[in-house]
């Protein structure tokens, strides 16, 4: 059992026998009212999304999910096929099922992912917390602007855009933190 104040992004809870993924959780406490947790939830079976408010002391059933290592095998339109690294079983997911990691999924990637199962059914895939990708396009460095942390926009091979350090050039390999939507960590070593 979890309480409302323990909810955080990535937590899975059970509502009406369905697993719901907490995508966003915001704790609010005002002077007069009791503490509440505002959440954005996604049903892992149907993909339905909703916003719900829980009291800080509300009791919620947490869900234990099975996890297996998998790699991306191939992409066909909006269908992504992953292969279990131990028994080579193939699993297929739609783009909506993996929309949180979709900006960092690309053909030919070698990252070992975690396939997430609920009662034997594949419901999502999680990437490692740090991945390495190649910068496909970025502007040149801005001369003279060296005060503080200078960032500029860059585009990856699959079209994903993010901010990178000013010294990064086209073709450089960069590390990306995949939590919270993905952010630049540094140049890959």
Swiss-Prot record:
Localization, UniProt: Cytoplasm
Pfam families reported in the protein's UniProt record: EFP, EFP_N, Elong-fact-P_C
Chain ranges passing through the membrane: none
Superkingdom: Bacteria
Gene Ontology annotations of biological process type: peptide biosynthetic process
GTP-binding in keyword set: no
GO cellular component: cytoplasm
InterPro entries xref list: Elong-fact-P_C, NA-bd_OB-fold, Rib_uL2_dom2, Transl_elong_fac_P/YeiP, Transl_elong_KOW-like, Transl_elong_P/YeiP_cen, Transl_elongation_fac_P, Translation_prot_SH3-like_sf
Molecular function GO terms recorded: translation elongation factor activity
UniProt pathway annotation: Protein biosynthesis; polypeptide chain elongation
KW Protein biosynthesis (keyword) present: yes
Keywords for the protein's UniProt record, in alphabetical order: Cytoplasm, Elongation factor, Protein biosynthesis
Its biological purpose: Involved in peptide bond synthesis. Stimulates efficient translation and peptide-bond synthesis on native or reconstituted 70S ribosomes in vitro. Probably functions indirectly by altering the affinity of the ribosome for aminoacyl-tRNA, thus increasing their reactivity as acceptors for peptidyl transferase.
Record-stated family: Belongs to the elongation factor P family.
HAMAP family assigned to the protein according to its UniProt record, in alphabetical order: EF_P
NCBIfam families: PRK00529.1
The protein, known as: Elongation factor P
